Amino acid sequence: MEQLRKRVVRFTNNDDDDFEPVFLNEQDQDAFVEQLRLTNNRDNRMFSIIFSFLYLLLIVPLFLYPEYWAFKLVELLSLFYCAYVMYFLPLEVGLFNPKTPNKWKFLFILNIGVTALITVLGWSQHTSFFYAFLNIRTLVCGITIFTEIARYSMYHSTLSVEKLDEMRFAHM
């Protein structure tokens, strides 16, 4: 009978003194972790699709202001690159992941660096700092940085579910 002991996880709530702890058996834990994994994968996929289309929609304003075509071309390539990275690359490939090959890290840094350089060059052409800051180039630079931050947080939310999966059946 000792070998048939249930493995349980106890969840407590420190806000209520009268609160009874919730016990989950193996099947409930498996179902709970699988539900978290599915929800996390669905949310990450949804964010990837939304951000990819957002980047492609932001290409339209680039054609509305008359400036250097070389800058526009680099900004277009940067937005296409962000959309590609967000939609096609797995979350494990990122700037902050030590397992990422150096060629991808170089491309991430190059994309951010080139858009930042073009942003600074665009700022130097304007007399008003306020107008220069609200320029579309600043938005493109911000988007490239936001891409890496979003992918970093999406990757770590996936890791959190995996860590929870490893902690199942712990005895309290």
UniProtKB/Swiss-Prot annotation:
Subcellular location, principal: endoplasmic reticulum
Keyword annotations from UniProtKB, A to Z: Endoplasmic reticulum, Membrane, Transmembrane, Transmembrane helix
Glycosyltransferase recorded as keyword: no
Top-level taxon: Eukaryota
Membrane topology, from the record: Multi-pass membrane protein
Listed transmembrane segments: 46-66, 76-96, 104-124, 129-149
Disulphide bridges: none
Gene Ontology CC terms, in alphabetical order: endoplasmic reticulum; endoplasmic reticulum membrane
Protein name: Uncharacterized membrane protein C660.17c
Subcellular location: Endoplasmic reticulum membrane
